[in-house]
């Protein structure tokens, strides 16, 4: 890559890192379709973007953990499932044709939008009722101060026996598509497990790094990673994610949810268009 292209990738990665950190999608979720639009094959885009996922997670997670928004206990439970799914998904990418991947993650993101509509309000999340036996045994709960809404928010995880296995599907999507898995993780945590929007976003960012690390090992061994491209994306998304982590605590939870849904709709349109284009080639 020449210097102009490297600089362009850095700028786009910086912007993607900010948005990815704010929404929990991960900077690579925004970066991958841009690389495809610039002419890079989908599988190479996914492989190199997976590397930057690790940087996005590391860059933003430190601040979120310090502010006590991220729920580490919930993250450790869900990572059991996402890491397994990430490895499986990476191998699927190497085996499946690109057109199948386009339509697969477009369908996947439509499911994300459906789950987003089922998310409860913050008041519902705060109530310690209708907790199943397994979730009571795990006892995953937390409290944090939201400077955007100017209130303390308490919550407890519900339906962990459903949310955990569904995270394996998110892991497969993260490993095979590298795009939209963050949105799916966030939707599962809010809509099924009952986490507040900001906790779901920050915990998703924390989980994304571990899932990406598992998938990256497969892509690196298969020769799909370009060191210069991956390094440029990693630097940009890492800086962007740090900036995003400074912005998130001061904006309202509703704003985070709306921004996440807008980006998800954009990704659906982009991938359906690419999939249809592949069919006509």
Task: Show where each model-derived region lies.
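Juxtamembrane transmembrane-helix termini in multi-pass membrane transport proteins
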Residues: 23-80
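Juxtamembrane transmembrane-helix boundary motif
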Residues: 1-16, 36, 42, 66-171, ...
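Membrane-embedded alpha-helical segments of transport systems
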Residues: 51-59, 81-88, 92, 207-214
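Generic transmembrane alpha-helix signature in multi-pass membrane proteins
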Residues: 30-32, 58-69, 171-175, 185-190, ...
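Conserved kink/hinge residues within transmembrane alpha-helices of Major Facilitator Superfamily
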Residues: 20, 24, 59-60, 86, ...
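Short helix-coil transition sites and intra-membrane helix breaks within transmembrane domains
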Residues: 18-28, 174-181
């Amino acid at each position: 890559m020449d210097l102009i292209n490297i600089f362009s990738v850095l700028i786009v990665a910086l912007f993607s890192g900010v948005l990815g950190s704010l929404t929990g999608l991960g900077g690579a979720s925004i970066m991958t379709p841009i690389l495809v639009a610039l002419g890079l094959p989908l599988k190479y885009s996914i492989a190199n973007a997976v590397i930057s996922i690790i940087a996005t997670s590391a860059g933003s997670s430190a601040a979120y953990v310090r502010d006590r928004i991220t729920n580490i206990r919930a993250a450790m439970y869900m990572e059991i499932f996402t890491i397994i799914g990430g490895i499986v998904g990476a191998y699927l990418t190497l085996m499946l044709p690109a057109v199948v991947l386009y339509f697969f993650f477009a369908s996947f993101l439509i499911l994300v939008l459906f789950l987003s509509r089922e998310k409860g309000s913050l008041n519902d999340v705060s109530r310690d009722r209708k907790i199943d036996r397994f979730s009571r045994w795990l006892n995953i709960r937390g409290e944090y101060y939201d400077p955007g809404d100017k209130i303390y928010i308490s919550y407890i995880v519900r339906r962990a026996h459903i949310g955990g296995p569904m995270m394996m599907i998110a892991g497969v999507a993260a490993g095979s598509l590298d795009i939209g898995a963050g949105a799916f993780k966030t939707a599962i945590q809010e809509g099924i497990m009952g986490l507040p929007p900001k906790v779901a976003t920050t915990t998703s960012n924390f989980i994304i790094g571990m899932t990406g690390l598992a998938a990256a090992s497969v892509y690196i061994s298969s020769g799909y990673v370009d060191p210069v491209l991956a390094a440029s994306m990693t630097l940009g998304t890492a800086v962007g994610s740090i900036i995003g982590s400074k912005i998130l605590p001061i904006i309202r939870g509703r704003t985070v949810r709306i921004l996440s849904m807008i980006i998800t709709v954009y990704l659906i349109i982009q991938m359906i268009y690419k999939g249809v284009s592949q069919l006509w080639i």
